[in-house]
Every structure is written in C-alpha cells, then in structure tokens.
From Swiss-Prot:
Molecular function terms from GO: 4-(cytidine 5'-diphospho)-2-C-methyl-D-erythritol kinase activity; ATP binding
Organism, scientific name: Tropheryma whipplei (strain TW08/27) (Whipple's bacillus)
Active site, per annotation: D243
Protein name: 4-diphosphocytidyl-2-C-methyl-D-erythritol kinase
Entry's EC annotation: 2.7.1.148
Protein residues bound to ATP: P201, V202, A203, A204, G205, L206, A207, G208, G209, S210, A211
Catalytic activity: 4-CDP-2-C-methyl-D-erythritol + ATP = 4-CDP-2-C-methyl-D-erythritol 2-phosphate + ADP + H(+)
Enzyme type, top EC level: transferase
Biased composition (Polar residues): 1-22
Domain of life where this protein originates: Bacteria
Gene3D superfamilies in UniProt: 3.30.230.10, GHMP kinase, C-terminal domain
InterPro entries given in the database record: GHMP_kinase_C_dom (IPR013750), GHMP_kinase_C_sf (IPR036554), GHMP_kinase_N_dom (IPR006204), IspE (IPR004424), Ribosomal_Su5_D2-typ_SF (IPR020568), Ribsml_uS5_D2-typ_fold_subgr (IPR014721)
C-alpha cells in the first residue's frame, strides 16, 4: 500500500497483471461513472471499445467474462441504456436486464412510459426524479492494463478525508473484491483507477464514505466482470460497515441485526430539506456518548422501535399512507447523544419545525446534518428559502418513488 501526497492510495496485488483477457484479445479499456449518494447508485457505462460504436446496440457479447466464468444472463444492454443519456442502467449486474421501456417503467414507480422506447434517444424526462435527486459523490472508474498499481484511489478535490488507507472504505471495498479474485486462483487483475469527487460532506451523518464503498463494489464488480449479483454484494458489504449493505440497493428500507438484513419498501416520492452544519461531528464520539447515556439507570429505547418486526410493518403502512403518517414515526436514537456533543442541534431542530409545511426534523445518521420531511415539493423549497435567510446552509431534495420491481433487477 502506497500513498501519494495524502490524496492517492495505491495498492499492489500478489499476482502479476496479464495484458490479455481469457479470449486472447487485448484487454478492452472501459470507462465507468459511478454515482453514489445516500439512497441510490446509478452505474452508467460511458465508453467500451468492443468493436461497436454503441454498447447498447452490442448484440454479440460472449457468454463468459474475462475470467472465463460463465455469464448466466448475457444481455446486449448490460450496464447502460444509452451512452449519451448519462442515466443509470437497470440490471447492471445482468440479473435483471430489461429494455428501455421497462427501465422507464421501473424508474417512474411502475407508472409505465408513454413514449416509444428508442435506444438512440432515451426519454430523459422519465428519469427526472432520478437525475435531480439529492447530493451524490461521483466516482469515475477507469480500467486499463497500463498502470503500475492494480488499484488506485485518488480524491479529485485534493482532500483525502482519512489518513490511513485501511480506514478508507472505498479502498477496503476494492481490496475485498480483489481478494476474491485471488481466491479464485486467477492471474488476471485489471488496473483500476478510481477518482472520488466528494460532494457529500464528511462527518455529516450522510453516509458519504459508506456510499463510496457501495459504489466501488458495484463499479468494480461490473468493470472486472466478476458477475456477483447485488444480493451477493449485499452479503459482502456487511464486512465494510452496517450501512453499506443498504446502500448497495438504495431506496427505502428497514435494516435489522448488524445491517446485513435489509427489507425494502415500495414508496411514493418524498420531499426533504437537508440542513448542514459548518462543523463536523465524529460518529465514534456520538456512539460513545450514546453508550454512556444508555449505561445510566432508567434508560429505555424508543417504544415505537423496541420490536423490529412491528417496526418494519409500521413503517411499511406509514409510507403507503403518506408523509404525515411517516413523520409521526421518525425518530433517531442518536439525537440525545448528538445534542450533548453539539447543543446547538436542539435549537436548529426547533427552528426547522417552525417552517410551514415541515412535518418533522431529525438528525441524519449521527449528525449534525438535519433531515426535514416536507409535505410536498413546494413546502420543501419554501422551508429551504426561509432557512437560508437565517444563515442555514441547506438543500431541498427528493427521494424517487420505488416499486417492488426495482429490487427484482
């Protein structure tokens, strides 16, 4: 493991690189862009030099990957809908490949697409909720056979949030799949460079690092053609952190145990306002404070969430009924600990809930970011404007609707 100026991690591998794939052809250069945020990942293949101008039109994909392993569901639309759309593919792991009309239907919450599908001119309006969704880190992932180090991770904005490479979840995710390839006794490991553009604030309770890890798992799985399904990746993601499995899929979900057991819910579009703090809050310190508080006498868990099975059912029903019902259930056990470490959070929550149309304000993750649930898009934008006038840094976002068919891909 080597570092370059604190902004780039480079990891070598125990086996030599091979510049040819198992079919005896030069290793193709593929460039991927992985968009990661706290609720979704969209993988879009930008270019693939496979003898065809448009990979969407490529109908001659082989039934084995570059490691010689069989591809169970070969599909001409693997990875992308269109190279010009900058919109993520459905079925990027090739377990649920669909045509564009079906992709539109999925991303519009099962409403279907009213226009004729066209590979060369996809209906970008069908993806409005997706393309405009929230904040995301962007991880361009380049694969070639010319780099000295098989795995390189660099931070595009010149700031590496961690000092130790093994504390970097993105690097740990890359090495996790690298180790799997080693165990499969293959001698082919393509050089991979990942440049992370951090747009999600660090130490803000928004799972930005975990989102990066999940995006790396998805991107490398596709780029290296290791052919793990998302269910396979979900199981592996648990080794990286409790919230990484959820981020493999995104959407709305209930996690239990250590986070590896995830139950997904169908949702309608929800509107939120994210309020940021100028100061970070250490997740480790928040949990330490929570442990201290819970070690005291008379400490009880929130009654609504004391029974996992009941909790999942209550959330499912509330989400179906709408934002008002969901707001009544919103709670974060870390709130008291975060308030103890950053007392101004309490006043920020009160100020946020005074905004018309804001149904509930809670801290996101371990804080200090606040997540404000709004009754509709107008209320979210109005609250954002009001809070900005008081000096609060905030952003109105929406979470797309999800139908059950999304998680079948």
């Amino acid at each position: 493991m080597k570092t370059d100026g604190g902004n780039t991690w480079r990891a070598s591998h125990s086996k030599p690189l091979n510049t040819a794939n198992t079919m005896g052809e030069p290793f193709s250069h593929s460039e991927y862009s992985v968009h990661a945020d706290q609720s979704e990942f969209y993988l879009n293949e930008l270019t693939e030099h496979s003898g065809q101008d448009n990979p969407c039109m490529n109908t001659s994909r082989l039934n084995t990957n570059r490691y010689g392993h069989p591809v169970v569901h070969p599909c001409p639309k693997i990875h992308c809908i269109c190279t010009q759309s900058n919109i993520a593919a459905i079925g990027s792991d090739c377990t649920g490949c669909v045509d564009i009309a079906q992709a539109c239907k999925m991303l519009r919450g099962g409403q279907g697409c009213t226009q004729d599908p066209c590979v060369k001119n996809p209906h970008t309006q069908c993806f409005t909720d997706v393309s405009n969704h929230a904040m995301r880190n962007v991880l361009p992932l380049n694969v070639s056979n010319t780099e000295q180090f098989p795995i390189q991770i660099e931070y595009a904005n010149g700031r590496n949030p961690v000092l130790n490479p093994m504390d970097d979840l993105a690097m740990r995710a890359a090495l996790l799949l690298s180790k799997d390839i080693d165990l499969q006794n293959t001698h082919i490991l393509p050089s991979t460079r990942i440049s992370i553009e951090k747009n999600i604030p660090v130490a803000a309770g928004l799972a930005g690092g975990s989102a990066d890890a999940a995006a790396v798992l998805l991107g490398i799985n596709s780029a290296w053609q290791t052919n793990y399904s998302r269910c396979d990746l979900l199981g592996k993601a648990g080794a990286l952190g409790a919230d990484v499995p959820f981020l493999i899929w995104g959407g709305a979900a209930y996690g239990s145990g250590t986070g590896s057991c995830v139950t997904f819910f169908e949702t309608q579009t929800l509107y939120w306002v994210l309020c940021f703090s100028k100061h970070p809050l250490s997740t480790r310190k928040v949990f330490q404070e929570l442990d201290r508080q819970r070690s005291g006498a008379g400490c009880n868990h929130h009654p609504v969430f004391s029974n996992p099975a009941e909790c999942a059912e209550m959330l499912k029903k509330a989400i179906k009924r709408g934002p008002e019902a969901l707001a009544a259930l919103l709670h974060n056990d870390l709130t008291s600990a975060a308030k103890m470490l950053m007392p101004e959070i309490a006043e920020r929550i009160k100020a946020a809930e005074r905004c018309p149309g804001i149904l509930r304000a809670i801290i996101s993750g371990s804080g200090p970011t606040l997540a404000l649930l709004a009754e509709d898009a107008e209320a979210a934008n109005r609250a954002c404007s009001i809070l900005k006038d008081t000096g609060v840094i905030c952003k109105a976002v929406s979470s797309p609707a999800y139908s059950s068919i999304y998680w079948q891909t």
